[in-house]
Design a protein with these regions (language model features):
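N-terminal cap/lid segment of alpha/beta-hydrolase-fold proteins
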Residues: 1-36
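Short beta-strand element of the alpha/beta-hydrolase
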Residues: 27-30, 38-49, 69
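Cap/lid segment of the alpha/beta-hydrolase catalytic domain
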Residues: 60-61, 66-120, 178-187
């Protein structure tokens, strides 16, 4: 934190893991400008976490006072999956992942699947930002890579507040029937956890969480990217949601030599794209 912008660890309640469960606590780092003015809001969503992770989740700095930002962790991942020693000091206990393999958690249970909760976590995070006096909710943006790209699509599709623009990079969770024919993960996890479901039933279940379908609800401007050598979230799975977007204000960048990674020029590209659409 600085005099320009204060950084807070925020804890908020999100939907239960199942309809009859208890609310789930999720967390993020919130950066609030201190000048008393309203600022554009940028939501940041993380990629797929690691089990027993020890890396420190990114935290915003206090010097960039142009934006109100939320670096948000969905249930069981990142901030919600770190020991106290692997976070910036906050005086709280270890936070533990109770879900095991996130993609497999309650697989096949539409109202209890992991990504149902995760998508709603992101919706709740936007609702939190709307409560802050410094948030200009008429200028709302989201960005993320891999899983974070999928979450950017999901929140733009499902949020109570319309997004101005989003920036999904090498996005996850796209066009499952083709996705599972192209690469082994998460197809192997899905097939190992589908129980008695036929493939047709499995894909019908996954259709609720497919960015290709979520994209049909999105009117925000979109800047996207894909690596043509990506063996985790291949180009086709990125193009499928992009093609289904309602918006005509969209652009996708292809990086011929890039795998599953973030381009070195990506942050500059997306911030220029966002700034061009700010009021």
């Amino acid at each position: 934190s600085t005099d320009k912008r204060k950084i807070y660890l925020v804890e908020l309640q999100s939907v239960p893991d199942s309809p009859d469960g208890d609310p789930v606590i999720v967390r993020g780092y919130y950066a609030e400008p201190q000048d008393g003015q309203k600022h554009p809001v940028i939501m940041h969503f993380y990629g797929y976490d690691s089990q027993n992770a020890t890396s420190w989740p990114p935290c915003p700095n206090g010097n960039d006072s142009e934006y109100a930002e939320f670096f948000f962790s969905i249930r069981g991942q990142m901030l919600n999956n770190r020991a106290a020693a692997n976070r910036y000091p906050d005086g709280k206990e270890d936070f533990k992942n109770i879900y095991g393999d996130w993609f497999a958690y309650n697989f096949g249970v539409k109202d209890g699947y992991y990504y149902r909760g995760a998508f709603m976590d992101c919706v709740q995070a936007v609702r939190f930002m709307a409560t802050r006096e410094t948030s200009d909710m008429t200028q709302l943006f989201a960005e993320g890579s891999s899983q974070g790209g999928a979450l950017s699509y999901a929140v733009a599709a499902l949020s109570d507040y319309p997004f101005t623009a989003i920036a999904p990079c090498v996005a996850f969770l796209g066009d499952f029937p083709d996705y599972f024919n192209i690469v082994s993960w998460p197809a192997e996890t899905a097939k190992a956890n589908k129980g008695s479901m036929t493939n047709e039933e499995m894909y019908a279940f996954l259709s609720y969480f497919d960015t290709k379908n979520l994209a049909t609800r999105i009117t925000a401007s979109v800047i996207a990217c894909s690596g043509l050598q990506d063996g985790t979230c291949p180009p086709h799975t990125n193009l499928a949601p992009y093609n289904n977007l309602l918006t005509e204000d969209k652009v996708i960048y292809y990086y011929p030599e890039m795998g599953h990674e973030i381009p070195s020029d990506w942050n500059k590209k997306i911030m220029n794209f966002f700034k061009e659409r700010m009021k």
